[in-house]
């Protein structure tokens, strides 16, 4: 009997690990947030109404790119801008974002990482992330970038306007829309990250399963072998990584650091 119960729990855990993200208006904000947390773009518990700084947005861009697994290789040596020392939490992300041409510094040698990012700045950066060049746009900044972003769906469900500072909620939605949008070459951007994109839906399971370990059944005193960046309990974000006896769980030891737990049955 015990073996049969255990097999059932494992089957349940495997089933919930396959995550398909819908794009209906009723669920897209939660879907975008869960995707951002999973990719490490937004820390668990972040106030979604807070404005996003340029430094934080550089991290979000990198997290939604193929460079998200190479951040540690950047190291902490050297100063790219006079206001971004190598020891800054944003330094490796800013270095990647600038090297890839997604963001730029200012002529005075500063990056101004604590300045808030506006709608037009965010759209311009994401368009570059999708390999769009100025020659692909019509007009001048910022209207050309805003129009192109609207045309390819980056601004779907976004209500902010030109000049407005972007919040975490708005940035996660913008970047989630980028996964569904076509790049300059005409292919869905999410596909380049290993996601399956079909009919406006993004399936992240193919990426998450690569680094997933488990499922496991917790015993008395079981602890995760690391501190996870994000935790999901019964498909909902949780602030606690504590495991109870007979909990069924799986986790990823990649840079994402995601842990998911199914309550004991």
Give the location of each predicted region.
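Conserved redox-cofactor binding core of oxidoreductases
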Residues: 176
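Repeat-associated, polar segments at repeat-unit boundaries in modular proteins
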Residues: 247-254, 258-264
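Feature responds to low-complexity, polar/acidic, surface-exposed segments characteristic
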Residues: 2-58, 62-91, 100-120, 126-165, ...
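N-terminal cofactor/phosphate-binding cores enriched in small/glycine residues
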Residues: 97
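Short nucleic-acid-contacting surface segments enriched for D/E, G, S/T with interspersed K/R
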Residues: 235-249
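Surface-exposed binding/hinge segments that line
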Residues: 169
């Amino acid at each position: 009997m015990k073996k049969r119960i255990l097999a059932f729990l494992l089957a349940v855990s495997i089933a919930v690990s396959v995550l398909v993200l819908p794009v209906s208006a009723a669920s897209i904000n939660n879907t975008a947030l869960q995707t951002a947390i999973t990719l490490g773009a937004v820390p668990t518990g972040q106030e979604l109404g807070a404005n996003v700084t340029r430094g934080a947005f550089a991290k979000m861009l990198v997290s939604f790119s193929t460079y998200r697994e190479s951040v540690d290789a950047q190291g902490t040596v050297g100063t790219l801008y006079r206001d971004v020392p190598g020891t800054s939490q944003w330094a490796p992300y800013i270095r990647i974002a600038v090297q890839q041409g997604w963001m730029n510094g200012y002529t005075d040698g500063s990056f101004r990482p604590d300045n808030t990012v506006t709608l037009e700045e965010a759209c311009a950066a994401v368009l570059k992330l999708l390999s769009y060049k100025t020659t692909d746009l019509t007009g001048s900044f910022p209207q050309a970038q805003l129009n192109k972003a609207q045309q390819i769906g980056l601004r779907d469900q976004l209500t902010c306007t030109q000049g407005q500072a972007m919040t975490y909620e708005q940035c996660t939605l913008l970047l989630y829309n980028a996964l569904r949008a076509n790049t300059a070459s005409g292919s869905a951007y999410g596909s380049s990250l290993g996601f399956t994109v079909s009919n406006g839906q993004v399936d992240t399971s193919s990426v998450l399963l690569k680094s997933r370990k488990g499922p496991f059944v917790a015993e008395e005193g079981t602890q995760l072998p690391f501190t996870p960046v994000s935790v999901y309990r019964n498909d909902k974000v949780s602030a606690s990584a504590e495991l109870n006896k007979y909990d069924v769980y799986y986790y990823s030891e990649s840079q994402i650091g995601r842990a998911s737990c199914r309550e004991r049955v």
